[in-house]
């Protein structure tokens, strides 16, 4: 009997060592800094939505997994002029998940651009938030929107079905009504009004190499994003560059005033005086600094309200 016990002892020791090794492997896995971005298709109301998600490592998550939805601008895509991917990397280190999507007719979307409307964009944001909640248990949610994506983000608390905690607006096209389309002909607003009239009469109109539907024009005409911001009173970060060009001084002034009137509104301009509407520059060093500053300001704002 003593001999049998001696035979089993080494196996018991090996089993214990193996269990310890598995625990170490599991711990190391949890301590990985973040997961890689993953391209997926999210079911939407009109078909699948091309999207990229990025989740923090489990060790970086709190009890609730915050979410940021990144919304690109007119004729843009989910790369966000090169800013979205690195910002998603920044956010996961703070335990915040992200999803960035291509709206109708943009990026990898197979829909016609005629489906690009404010209502459809809000529905797509509904779909991705719902998917992230159901699949990953996300909680507090913020939106980041650039240009037309900023207008959408401003309006989403009115148009969407999910509550949001905060909004970050990069150079939003927030002119009232059709003024939000001023970028189509910044020096001649009468031309914008003419395009809108043609869309109303013909069902759509070509501009900037895409087909704009009457539904898109109607949504723009009927919306007032700055009034929506003031009505909801959410925490809002607003940035504009020093060389917007396609957004009028009036739009910028009115939007700044709207955000500054909010209890927790923040306007940041100085770091971006040398940038264009997309927060880029032909000078490589300036371009790099613009991206770094835009991400830093935005991440600081988001973490302060989501954690």
Language model: regions and residue ranges:
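Catalytic nucleophile-loop/oxyanion-hole region of alpha/beta-hydrolase
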Residues: 78-80, 106-138, 288-289
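N-terminal cap/lid segment of alpha/beta-hydrolase-fold proteins
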Residues: 28-61
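Conserved alpha/beta-hydrolase
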Residues: 88-110
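Active-site glycine-rich loops that stabilize anionic/oxyanionic intermediates
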Residues: 65, 72-77
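Alpha/beta-hydrolase fold nucleophile elbow
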Residues: 136-147
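The serine-hydrolase catalytic nucleophile loop
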Residues: 76-88, 103, 250-251
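The alpha/beta-hydrolase serine catalytic core
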Residues: 49, 151, 158, 163-301, ...
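Glycine-rich nucleophile elbow surrounding the catalytic serine of serine-hydrolase chemistry
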Residues: 145-155
């Amino acid at each position: 009997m003593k001999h049998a016990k001696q035979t089993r002892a080494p196996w018991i020791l090996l089993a214990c060592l193996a269990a310890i090794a598995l625990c170490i492997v599991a711990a190391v896995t949890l301590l990985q800094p973040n997961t890689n971005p993953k391209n997926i298709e999210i079911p939407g109301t009109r078909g699948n939505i091309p999207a990229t998600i990025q989740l923090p490592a489990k060790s970086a998550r709190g009890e609730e997994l915050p979410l940021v939805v990144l919304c690109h601008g007119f004729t843009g895509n989910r790369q966000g002029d090169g800013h979205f991917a690195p910002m998603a990397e920044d956010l996961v280190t703070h335990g915040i998940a992200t999803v960035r999507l291509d709206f109708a007719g943009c990026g990898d979307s197979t829909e016609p651009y005629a489906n690009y409307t404010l209502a459809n964009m809000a529905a797509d944001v509904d779909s991705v938030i719902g998917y992230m909640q159901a699949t990953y248990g996300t909680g507090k949610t913020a939106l980041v929107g650039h240009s037309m994506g900023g207008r959408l983000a401003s309006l989403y608390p009115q148009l969407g079905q999910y509550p949001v905690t905060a909004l970050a607006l990069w150079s939003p096209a927030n002119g009232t009504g059709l003024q939000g389309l001023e970028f189509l002909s910044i020096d001649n607003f009468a031309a914008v009004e003419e395009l809108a009239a043609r869309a109303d009469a013909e069902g759509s109109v070509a501009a900037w190499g895409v087909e704009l539907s009457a539904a898109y024009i109607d949504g723009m005409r009927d919306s007032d994003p700055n009034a929506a911001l003031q009505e909801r009173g959410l925490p809002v970060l607003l940035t504009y560059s020093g060389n917007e060009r396609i957004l009028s001084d009036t739009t910028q002034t009115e939007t700044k005033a709207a955000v500054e009137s909010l209890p927790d509104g923040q306007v940041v301009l100085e770091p971006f005086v040398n940038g264009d509407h997309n927060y880029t520059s032909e000078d490589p060093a300036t371009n790099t600094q613009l991206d770094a500053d835009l991400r830093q300001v935005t991440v600081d704002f988001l973490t302060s309200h989501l954690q």
